[in-house]
């Protein structure tokens, strides 16, 4: 007696699919698997450049298989291995030509050996470069001229991050409830005037770094993510701004052993005066001098190193007769903090931001810093005001540094450089 059986549907489906794949010429399982065999340097090796500035030729590597053919889709990791510096991109996928590249901004120390490694798995290619110090009076620019650095030879570094006007279409506008996009009107022009007036009357030039992009595109006074909202090209400009600033600081340190960093801004607060930000809050500035000197506020300030090297007390440096505020007021520019206005009280006041924290001496190092928030009328409102303020700044900084700058004779405790 025969018993009828029903075919297994799953088995039939498998047989049909296998037949279709074979009939359609599916992938040949016997085809060889391509394996990465080498990363070859194409350009960007053994070049000379300027500290803090991108090399004229970017490092480029080409990924090749065991037959010497270029390989697309290989993930290449770029890493600085010597000299500091920065990269526009650290992880890059090779294109159809098998190539990957990154912009290499050399480290700030011209004496340091500069080196870079490109790696894909265990396969690597190494690059080297030599850096020279920025030349006083020379202008260096980043990609598309978005960031500009006019090198100096004085121990003064001035940045203007919020005065730019460029609005390139390739950069999206920064948006969000936490985003500030107000422009500090005429601070770019004021910074340029300061550089020229110093050159004419002080026997040298300060280092000037300018963001030419409007603040809707980038905020260089914020950490990277907030500054660029994750845009890669805006990130490149941010990296250039801080790389130029680090190079300027290093040049000042190498030439003079010390320096003063000024982050230049503009405010629209009701009281027309300079607001000098040392990273101390209005509440801290309201404390009596004795409390200010004893409570460790010095270590939280952007002038930590300068204060510890000065014969004056911390409170005196902030608002005494030889403070920046008092010296500005002697030149006709009302300021806070100062002798006449030791604290802002309940009035609006900017006490310093990301740049002052990063580039001042709160975390150590020989370069101290201050954020200058300039009122509009009488400071930023035209060429005559720019020149008058710049002339006053020549006098103020000369007197301030003479009174407080570190010297070999100083017996006060030095501050070691530490990472922020």
Positions of the model-derived regions?
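Generic structural signal for beta-strand residues in well-ordered domains
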Residues: 21, 54, 69, 149-151, ...
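Bacterial N-terminal signal peptides that target proteins for export
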Residues: 2-13
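Bacterial N-terminal signal peptides
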Residues: 13-22
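Intrinsically disordered, low-complexity segments enriched in proline/serine/threonine
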Residues: 9, 61, 104, 416-418
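The feature marks long extracellular or luminal low-complexity segments
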Residues: 24-136
């Amino acid at each position: 007696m025969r018993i009828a059986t029903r075919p297994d549907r799953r088995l039939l489906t498998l047989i049909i699919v296998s037949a279709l794949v074979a009939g359609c010429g599916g992938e040949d399982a016997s085809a060889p698997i391509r394996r990465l065999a080498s990363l070859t340097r194409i350009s960007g090796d053994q070049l000379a450049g300027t500290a803090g500035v991108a090399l004229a030729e970017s490092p480029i590597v080409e990924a090749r298989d065991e037959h010497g053919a270029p390989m697309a889709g290989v993930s290449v990791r770029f890493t600085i291995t010597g000299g500091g510096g920065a990269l526009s991109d650290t992880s890059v996928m090779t294109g159809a030509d098998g190539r990957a590249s990154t912009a290499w901004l050399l480290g700030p120390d011209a004496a340091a050996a500069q080196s870079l490694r490109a790696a894909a798995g265990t396969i690597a290619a190494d690059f080297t470069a030599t850096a020279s110090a920025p030349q006083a009076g020379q202008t260096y620019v980043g990609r598309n001229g978005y960031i500009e650095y006019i090198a100096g030879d004085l121990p003064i570094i001035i940045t203007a991050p919020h005065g730019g006007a460029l609005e390139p279409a390739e950069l999206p506008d920064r948006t969000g409830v936490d985003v500030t996009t107000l422009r500090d009107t005429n601070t770019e022009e004021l910074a340029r005037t300061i550089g020229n007036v110093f050159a004419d009357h002080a026997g040298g030039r300060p280092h000037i770094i300018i963001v030419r992009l409007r603040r809707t595109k980038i905020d260089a006074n914020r950490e990277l993510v907030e500054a660029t909202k994750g845009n890669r090209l805006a990130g490149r400009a941010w990296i250039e701004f801080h790389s130029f600033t680090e190079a300027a600081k290093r040049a000042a340190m190498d030439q003079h052993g010390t320096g003063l960093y000024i982050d230049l801004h503009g405010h629209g607060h009701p009281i027309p005066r300079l607001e000098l930000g040392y990273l101390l809050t209005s509440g801290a500035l309201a404390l009596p001098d004795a409390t200010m000197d004893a409570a460790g506020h010095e270590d939280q300030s952007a002038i930590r190193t300068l204060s510890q090297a000065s014969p004056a007390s911390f409170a005196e440096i902030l608002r005494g007769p030889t403070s920046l505020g008092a010296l500005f007021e002697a030149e006709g520019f009302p300021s806070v903090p100062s002798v006449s206005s030791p604290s802002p009280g309940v009035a609006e006041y900017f006490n310093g931001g990301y740049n002052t924290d990063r580039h001042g001496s709160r975390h150590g190092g020989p370069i101290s810093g201050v954020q200058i928030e300039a009122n509009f009328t009488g400071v930023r409102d035209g060429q005559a005001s720019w020149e008058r303020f710049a002339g006053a700044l020549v006098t103020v900084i000369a007197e301030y540094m003479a009174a407080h700058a570190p010297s070999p004779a100083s017996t006060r405790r030095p501050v070691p450089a530490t990472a922020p």
